[in-house]
Structures are given as structure tokens and as C-alpha cells.
């Protein structure tokens, strides 16, 4: 809440606002006025991530269309060069090429129960932070995490969960990974998913404009060679994307004849 935000700022905490952009809020969040309001309140950074329809109450109707994903990216790049507030994203390198932090090894996720998961929306684990070997060794030597990184990097520069939930299920079954949710329905939720586009949209890359983001991403948030030896079918993906964009574009109206 805004009141909670004010309390954090008054306490002198490094404070940011993370937003899950979806169909019902994209028009309000992708505005310079919203960022200016946060700056006026003293917020240090904002984080735009896009809604991913996963979990027990997934709502595909809220997910952004491919052209809206591009719109979010363009807005972030433009505002980074215009307004005095840090803007975080986790999906692109300095050239605007898509990447997945899990695939590149930048991050994994520790769930509430202590399970070391590939990423926040893959709620399965083999290892635990209570591993007597220590967290570092448990993550470094995990065949489960290694296979996930390699599978994801091999299949897409985007989100393997959104694009290929079937492969996620296969890998979970292969390793006998446990469901880390309290509800115990993560596998059924994977089965219920429909493949969709994620941040990998070949031909729609938007490079960073601001020198600071361009340099920092180039050296500290790159793909670290995860995709170096992978020949993705970017041309095929681009064709699929253009077909999708053409199918969803508003049709031109023929003017009435007198």
C-alpha cells in the first residue's frame, strides 16, 4: 500500500515499487506521470515485470499480448533515459536481446519451505538450504538445477515455463523433484498451462539508450555465454510472432460509400 511505502521511506530504507504489468493495469503503469509521482514520494527504484499466468488461479486473459510486451520494453528504455529513478528489469541484455536469469545462472530461488528452486515460478526442488554441505555446494553440484539451466537455454532465450511447460514437467519427472508448494498441486498446474510467447520476440529487440544501463548490463547482466553454442530458430520464432501480430492487429474499416 502507499501507506506502507511511506513508512519504509520514513525509516530510511532503500525502497522500490515492483509491479506485475497485466491487461488491467498496463494503461496506468506505463506512464511518465506514475514514475514522477513515485519520484516525488522519494522512491528509489521501480521494477516492471510482466504477469505470468501460472499457479492455481492462473488467468491467461490477464497476460500481455506480444505487442504489449514490446510496448513495456520500449517504455522502460525511454524512461531510463528521461526520469531520475532507477528502473529494473530482468529479461533483457544491453542490446535488448531476451534472456532468462535462471538460464544464465544469475539467479535461482529459495522457496518458503527452503527448497532451492530453478526460479520463482518453477516450484519444484531437489536440494534444500538445510543441506549439510552448505547452500553454495548444494546449488553448485545440483544436477537438477544444471539440467534446468541447460534445457531452458537450449530451447529459448525467453521463459521456458511459458513457452514449453511440457518440457518443464518432463525434467521434474526425470529428477523426481518434489513439489515445494503447500497446496501440492504444482504438477497439475503445469498440465493446465497453454504455451505462449514470453520475452523472446526476435526482430523486436530494443537496445538500451542510457549509457549507464548499457554498460552495466553489458558487463554485469549479460547472458554470460549461456546461449553461445545454441542455434535457436530465431527466424522461425520471428515468423510465428509476425503471424500472431497480424492476427491480432485491428482490421481496417472500409469507409461507407455514399
Model-derived segments and spans:
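Long, low-complexity, intrinsically disordered segments
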Residues: 223, 234-258
